[in-house]
Each structure stands twice: as structure tokens, then as C-alpha cells.
Amino acid sequence: DLINPLIGNPYGVEFGITVGDVVYDNLGLYDRHKAMMALMEIVQWNLPGNHDINFASPDASFANETFKSHFGPTYYSFNHGNVHFVALNNVEYAGDGKSFGNSGYRGFIPEHQLQWLAQDLANVSASKLIVIATHIPLISEADDGLSEIYSGPNTENFSSLLEILEPFSNIYGIAGHDTSNSWKVEVNHSHGWQGQPWIAHTLAEVRGSGWPKGLTDARGVKDSIMEDGNPNGFYVLKFDDRNVTPDFIPFPFGPDATQRLRITLDPPLSEIEGGSINRGTAHTDTKIVVNLFDGGIRDLVWAFIDDGGAQAMTYTVRTDPFVERLESIYQDTDSEYSPAARSAHIWEMDLPDGLGEGLHTVRIRTEDEFGQRREGAMTFEIIDQ
């Protein structure tokens, strides 16, 4: 999904960053991974994730020796333009046979990294944009699809990081790890941050929810839609002085804006014998549901029904009915999907009463908090039975 469309650097990017889980536990794949990534001819920076650990290590001290032998330090910084990039290793491994509660690792920035970061930022102008890259999110409001809501910081000593970042007014955080959700948390006074609010962005995944999940396409590749309804994809981060705009490019990749959102009727029109999707009788409680991929609470979404004017849709945190339907249809099969999880990028509105028989069109326009605009459309047919 990733390598072929990026050969030749069609987006003209300066470099790439992989925020952890470079491979899935098998560290012997690093050489092959590097060879494949080199085909894109794009400079790559890497961070270790929880799937890049030497699990036989007795503690955190030697957990990343294999990673370091292939990619270098696990935490570092560099400048590019007016941006100071900081990569931190916040995956703390308990050690072989040990655990932090019910997990063999936790989100935690070691003290020696915090000391290094304070010294590093002491030499950085307060006017620069600071981009913090970690594997485990700094903070998120996502859940795991099983109603376990991560309501606090995913990185336990997040507050210690905030203290070091206090002199800076332009910050953006990027992280991976969560294969169920993308989420943008505005870090503000409610988190103990008194400066200019900034975004801690848990990114949608290149691999999606995981390789063994979903239907198999004609290439033999599994559909890897995430539990929040995001397709798998990658990001092009665009920088303008001290501003960053994250552009999520979903699979299948391309510039077509209609690929950036999905429109669903929930519940769907009542199916008729021999009927097709979005053709049938309407329910009194049918809603139009839009999943704006990688969107968030500060984005705006409008619906246009047939020739009608713009109607603002209502933001809501809920599961995506499209994912619910896939989960239900393919449960207990070789093509089963992961359970639907609360999504941070859903908007809905009631399907208007009084729509007559025949074809109807829903057109969607969106504008995200960064000023990016998307459009999409869906037709449906009401049958009077």
C-alpha cells in the first residue's frame, strides 16, 4: 500500500518520520524494511515502538540495542527551517518476565531524556515551532474498542514534559501506537498547561488496524480499516513558518478529495428483496453520518440535501456505523474486523422528513481546524412500499 505510490517522492517531501513499531516484533526484518524504504529515495527518521523491543532484555537498559544498531539513537533532535524536531523514546520496557501492572511496558519518558531535552531546548529560540514525536501518545481520549477509555495522559509523566516546554508558544505533538483511533487533543489549562494551546495528535496508522483484519482485495492484501473508521494511510505535514498542517492521505492514495470522508445512513434504508445498498424505505430515526477521516471536534461539516441549502451537522463521539456493519457481517469468519471503537471524527444529522420517492443526493462540505476543505457526495433511493 505504501511503497509503490511513494517511489519518486511525488509529494516532494524533505524527509519522513516513522513514529515507532518499525516492524512487528520480528527484529530480523529491519534489513528488509530499510531496503524497501530506500526505494522511495526519501530520508527517513525512526523511533522505536513497543514492537521494536528486545524482549529478552532484563530491563529497559538493553531493550533497544537491536534498533540502535540499525537506526541509531532512540531519542534525538534536529532543525529543519523554522522547526525544531524532537524525537523521544517514551516506551519503557519492564524487562523479561516483568510488568507494569498488566503490561510489559508503559508510556514514560526517562529522567535522563528529560534532562537532555531541557539542555537541548535551552539552545533553541522561543520563536521556533517545536514538534515532539513519540511512539506512545502523550495524551489521548481514545478507547480500545472494548470501552476502555484512556481518559488521562498515555505518557505517565506528561506533566514533566510540559514543564520543560513552558518557554515555547508553538508546539505540535505527533504519535502512533494506537491502531484503533486517530485523535487530536488540544493541550490547554485543563492539563496544567498555561501557555498557547497546542495539539497532541495521535496519528492514523499506515498499517491500519492490523494486517490480519478485514476482507482480502484482488492483490491478496487485507482491508485494514481502523476501529474508528479511518482507512490506513500516511501524512504529509506542511510547515509555514510556525504553523503546521497535517494532511492525511488515505488508501487508495491520491489527491481526490472525495477519498477523505465517508457518508453513511444509520440505520440504513430498509432492505428490499433484490435491493442494493442505500435503496429502500426510510426509517423515522434515520441519520446521515459523516466520518471525516482524521478529523476532530474543532472541524466544521455541512450537509446539502438535494437542492437545499447548507445545514450544519452535529459533532458527536460515537462508533462509525460503517464499521459496525462490517463487524456484524464478517464476525467469526476469516475476514472478521476489529470491534468498532468510539471515533473522534463523526458528524450526524437527521434525514429530513418528507423526502419523496426516488433518488436523492447528500453533498458534504467540510473545513478542518487547519483550513483544509473536503467534499463528498452520496446518493440514495427511497422506495414506497
Question: What kind of feature is each model-predicted range?
Answer:
Residues 1-31, 384-385:
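N-terminal active-site segment of His-dependent metallophosphoesterases
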Residues 356-357:
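Surface-exposed loops/turns
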Residues 19, 121-146:
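Short acidic, glycine-rich surface-loop motifs adjacent to enzyme active sites
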Residues 42, 320-350:
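Aromatic sugar-binding surface patches on proteins
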Residues 14-16, 130, 171, 347:
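Conserved acidic residues
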Residues 190-295, 299-301, 350-352, 361-381:
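Binuclear metal-dependent phosphoesterase catalytic core
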Residues 27-126, 148-174, 178-240, 244-248:
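Extended active-site neighborhood of metal-dependent phosphoesterases/phosphodiesterases
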